[in-house]
Amino acid sequence: SMMPYPELPANAQAAGDSMVAKTKNFCEQYIDPAQIDREAQIRDGVIKGLGNIGVLGLTIDKNYGGAGMSHFNYCRVMEVIGGHCGSTAVFVNAHHSIGLRALELFGTDDQKSKWMPPLAAGDKLAAFALTEPLAGSDAANVRTTAEPTPDGTGYVINGEKRWITNGGIADVLTVMARTSDPAVPEGKITAFLVTPDMPGFEVVEDRMEKVGIRGTATGRIRFHEMVVPKENILGEVGRGLKLALTVLDFGRTTFSACCTGAAKFCIERMVARANTRQQFGQTLGEFELVQGKIADAAADMYAMESATYYTAALIDSGADDYMVETAMIKVFASDQLWRITNDCMQIWGGKGFFTDQPFERMMRDARLNLIGEGANDVLRCFIANVGFRHVGTELKGDRIKAEKEAKGNANKLMSVWINRASVMSESLVNPKVPVKHEHLRYYSRRLSKQIAQFGRQMKLVLAKHQEDVLNKQFVQARLADIATELFMASCVYSRLTAILLNGTI
């Protein structure tokens, strides 16, 4: 159930409030986003300061030097940073959300005791090294290899990693490499903890020039006959791909929180400009088209905020699977922020086009969000295909019955099966969306009807295309967008219910 909307316990809320205030104060005093963009570097003092206030180890267990906060509160902090400086947000995300996350989730007690305290304090920096020249969206196509040493004490790693945030400056890197497996000709992916002082580790480029997020150190690194002790294996041998995908779920959630913060900043500036700029004898805010842009931005920001914190709470609850939810919020938040920054610049007009305003930088920074942590097109296909698996299982039995009824006639089989799918879909009962407040009754009925309609269409699409649906990316994208919109609407509905009932969210 998506209700009630998650709330933090009072002590966690207070701790989060304090951390949010501390982070906001630090950002305003010490982080100059224009300077960071101009110099293409986040100064050491800023990084050290983030470590001192606890940002770089926020969710890490206190036993290992962290603050022990929830993912929910971590997202609150990342929202603040994301609304202030895109480069700093991506730096923190690369270090904490994915860089040391594999160690936090899959490391042994000995590994955590050895590696985690300096990482949590910010004395050392982390990076997550998955991407390669041939392994971008296709994460399983890793070509970096790790072969056992003759004495069995370690692995020899050879290969190259590219576009790794913090890659050239990190002290500890989680590196994905392909290890031998007799059952799999190409081998399986394993995660290793790697340090730059290992012989054979080479930083080819420490700071690659980029369109946006210019302050982060995006590097290219190479491994040549680099020996890594077997004690540095994270998780199980051959289970690195699952580890990587789990880590990216956390990164997508904080990505969405950063997008939420940036969207809030843009909306504040949109409103300020609309209330003060006059043309044709009235303020811009009196024109309907301007009002529409602000209203759309506010609605989408509220949706991304609601869904981000719902998903963060889902992760905190210990749920087994949240891959689809994290993919949905990442796609929605990054898509909408791109549109919001564009509309913000439009409202600011010619003045917004100059570099003394932050909007061109924010647009350049926002563009990465549609690519990083999983390209949006790929994630749309993923969202749809996960849905196909569930619905396809339901339809499998009907397919068998249809084959018996058709008695070998292929044309009749298709007709019978689609007819059965249509009848079954029409018989679906609208899901019950709880009505806790009278003001939401209309929206409850509407949401319930739309969810049921979507379920029917999913069944009909599968009945029509069958296995070929895996090649129908236009269909997949449309279904993924509908599913995402329904998820966003459900999160908003749940949150509004909580607000109307007790006014505390």
Language-model features: where?
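Short Pro/Gly-enriched beta-strand edge/turn motifs at strand-loop
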Residues: 124-130, 201-206
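A short core secondary-structure module
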Residues: 154, 158-203
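C-terminal helix-coil-helix/basic helical segment that borders enzyme active sites and/or dimer interfaces
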Residues: 275, 279, 302-332, 345-348, ...
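Glycine-rich beta->alpha junctions and the first turn(s) of the following alpha-helix
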Residues: 203-302, 368-369, 385-391, 400-487
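Amphipathic, small/basic residue-rich leader segments at the start of a protein or domain
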Residues: 1-94, 101, 105-114, 118-125, ...
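Short Gly/Pro-enriched turn/cap motifs at secondary-structure boundaries
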Residues: 134-137, 163-166, 182-183, 210-217
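A structural signal for short hydrophobic beta-strand segments in well-ordered beta-sheet cores
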Residues: 144-148
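Alpha-helix capping/hinge segments and adjacent helical runs
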Residues: 25-26, 54, 164, 213-214, ...
